[in-house]
Structure formats: structure tokens, C-alpha cells
Amino acid sequence: MADITTEQQGEWLLEMKNISKSFPGVKALDNVNLNVRPHSIHALMGENGAGKSTLLKCLFGIYSKDAGSIIFQGQEVNFKNSKEALEQGVSMVHQELNLVLQRTVMDNMWLGRYPRKGMFVDHKKMYQDTKTIFDELDIDIDPRDKGATLSVSQMQIIEIAKAFSYDAKIVIMDEPTSSLTEKEVNHLFSIIRKLKARGCGIVYISHKMEEIFQLCDEITILRDGQWIATQPVEGLSMDQIIAMMVGRSLSQHFPDRISEPGEVMLEVRNLTSLRQPSIRDISFDLHQGEILGIAGLVGARRTDIVETLFGIREKSAGTIRLHGKNIKNSSANEAISHGFALVTEERRATGIYAFLDVGFNSLISNIRSYKNKMGLLNNTRMKSDIQWVINAMRVKTPGHSAHIGSLSGGNQQKVIIGRWLLTQPEILMLDEPTRGIDVGAKFEIYQLMTELAKRGKGIIIISSEMPELLGITDRILVMSNGQMVGMVNTKETSQNEILRLASLYL
């Protein structure tokens, strides 16, 4: 299929030509191109570490490019920072939302540029201007509401409305649907299409293939810091996109696995958490070598189960038995001592120490084990274990001293999982482990889960991706509004059946 050309599509709104950027020991970008035209939604795809974030940081002046040019609306530009880019009409809606929760919605909309009447803020005009934008975008939110009262999807929409208020010509969206329900996603898509109709060029970053086919007009694919292709989405298949992203054909999305669950290792009976709203009367068994999925819609309290098992949430009732013996797991340290490990849902908030290095992040879950009787650290064993995490998990990093925040999401997740494996867990609990991660890294995590199950470990995975649960688990526990509404054998169920169960108590 022929690549999109200027002659085919008309003048570009944004042209990033032959952008190159190097860091010590790493060629992050090598002559990369990204061309976006008005009235279009342009997908930017690639595995974690392909160079997407670096390219956008060059656009916003966070990194200075080594070579290449950036042309916006026909003029060459070199933005010094994101504020200058925003003022010129280039906006980005981040995964990590930036609302001030204690302020009102309209305060957040106009922060730093309040309309004034003399020396005072003109609250009436600020309200009216916000309401006008909301009406144009069909946003049903009171401008006077506090940021803290908004859902994640509403916060996402406010960020888009803010870009709209700057009269942005280019809007970049980074994984905007990662925490949204299907209904919220559809509302977000309708707003994105309104921006497109106004002439905006949307750069859309997502690992969710179905969204790319549903929403996007063109796609640019990066791999290992290089531009691979820019093509119309229409006519492409999922397998073609994956092959361009990973450099090979992925004939299967999940590893081959023979399910051979052994004896019951974990027995949970009538588990109820103390904190409200809570889970109530949750009972299940986990077998050696089993991968157990937990499904449910947003608000089902799936995460509460693993947090209670791990001692983060206090239980008010119920029993936990490991290999036939009662355990309490009244704290995370106690849970770890019993062989539990938890990879949390919010990787950036609770999984990594973003400003510390890969080495520290590899060891932090097990740091006490490196101390001798004198309280001194065994540096030799620490270095050996750090290298094990990097090698065993195939972490792409310049070295163990690199800040983990500079790594791609997939590589950050590999470090987190690797550090828990250093604790030699019997039960590994994974909460949305592949959220925001590319297909190649997903497959590696599935392979790891399969290998651990083969060794007799018990795996619990929470996922909002139904194909993921159906593709990797043995059984699926279904939750609705804090209650367990079913336990199904994966081979004997369907997506529709799971969704039916998950909707029982809504």
C-alpha cells in the first residue's frame, strides 16, 4: 500500500522532518517523520521504547533535537517549552491529568489567564466563556463544580476543552481511554470528532487497536527510533500494523499453554473489607499452576480483593488459608513474608519511584534481604540481582543508573514485575498489568505468566481487556458492585456471558 504523500492529502498542518535525537549510548530517534494534516485524526503507534514520547518531547521543547526541522502552519518553529507551544496552538492531553482538584472546573480552564474586570477576576465572564465551550462540545459539566468531584473521564474531557479554549490547531492525546468505560469512550470520541470537524489535527497515541480502526484516518508507525510507515488506516489489518510495529509477524496474541492446575494453594472464604464501599463475602480457591482472572465493570471493586489479600486494605471478616494454614496478611510486609506479590494498577503513582534509577526500583520490594547482621548492604548481591532483572525481563535501558521515569511504560512494568520476582513469590497478583503497553511487551508478560504457572505459582490477574482474560486465564471470577457474581471456566464462557454477570447488581 502506498504511503500518504503531500500531493494526495494537501498541505500539512504539522511537519516533523528527519528528526534525530541521541542520548549517551542510545540513538532514540533516527530521521523520524510525522506529518499531520487538518481535519484528520492521525494515530502514532509503536512498541514502548519506539520513540513516540521522545519525538513529542522534541516538539514541545522538552528535548532539543539533534537534527531535523519542525514546521507548523507553514512556518518553521522551535518551541522552548510546552507553554509556548500551547500559546501557538499545539496542545497535549496527557495520561496523567493535571487538574487542580481543589479549584472549580472553570478555574482549571482559565488558570493563569483569568478574564479580568479592572483588578479583579471576572467570574461571570469566566463562567460564560466556559459554558459556551462546553455547549459547543456537548459537555454536560457544571463549570462551578470542584475538580475533586469529577470522574477520570470528565477530567480528560476538561483537558480537551482547555485545549479547545486555546484555539489549538494540533491536539495530541496520549492513551486517553486507558481508564474509561465504553460509554465514556464513546462520549470522548464524539468530542474528538468535533475537534476534527473544526479543522484540528489530532495525534492519537493508543495501544488499543480497535480504537485506531474506529477513530483514525492515518497512522504513522515507529520502531526502534526509526520511521517505518505513514499510511491510511483504511485497508490495513491489525496483523499488518503489528508486523510493522514489532518487525515480525505475530501469528498469535497469546502463548500456547497447557492448563495443568495442581492442588489448592490459597483458600479465601467470606472475605469482606473494612473500608467502605467494600467487597462482601468473597470466596474462591486458587490452585498451584492456575491463572485466575478477575473481571468486572468500573466500580466493581476488583482491586479491593487483591489489596485486601495483600494487607493494604483491612478485612472486617473472612479467612485466608495458604497451604491449609490460616494467615492474616494484616500488612503488606506480612503478605510478602507469606509469598504474596502485588503489581499495582497505577504504575506511575504506586509502582515506580520515577526520579530514582532502575537499580533502586529493581530492589525496593526486597531491600531488607540485602542487609547483614550489622545492617550493611551486600552490594555484590544487589548488583547481581539488578542485572538479573534487566536481563531476565529484557528491560531496554542504557543501564541500571538510568532514571526509571525515562523508560517506556512497558520497560517500567518489566522492572516492577522483575523486582517482585526477586522476592520469590508463590502468589503473584497483577492489576491491569498490560495497560498502556504495546503488543510485543504484552506477549512477553503473557509468556512470563505462563512460565510462572508452569512452575506451580498461583497467578491472579485483573484486567479490563476481555480478550486478555479469555486468552490467558483458566477461570474467571466475576465481580459486580463489590459482590462476587460468578466463577466461570474460561474455555466454557464468552465475553457476553461475563458482561451479563458483571451487570447483575448495577
UniProtKB/Swiss-Prot annotation:
Amino-acid positions noted as binding ATP in the UniProt annotation, renumbered to this chain: G46, E47, N48, G49, A50, G51, K52, S53
Entry's EC annotation: 7.5.2.11
Keywords assigned by UniProt, alphabetized: ATP-binding, Cell inner membrane, Cell membrane, Membrane, Nucleotide-binding, Repeat, Sugar transport, Translocase, Transport
Molecular function (Gene Ontology), one example: ATP binding
EC main group: translocase
Compartments where found: Cell inner membrane
Family: Belongs to the ABC transporter superfamily. Galactose/methyl galactoside importer (TC 3.A.1.2.3) family.
Subunit record text: The complex is composed of one ATP-binding protein (MglA), two transmembrane proteins (MglC) and a solute-binding protein (MglB).
Protein name: Galactose/methyl galactoside import ATP-binding protein MglA
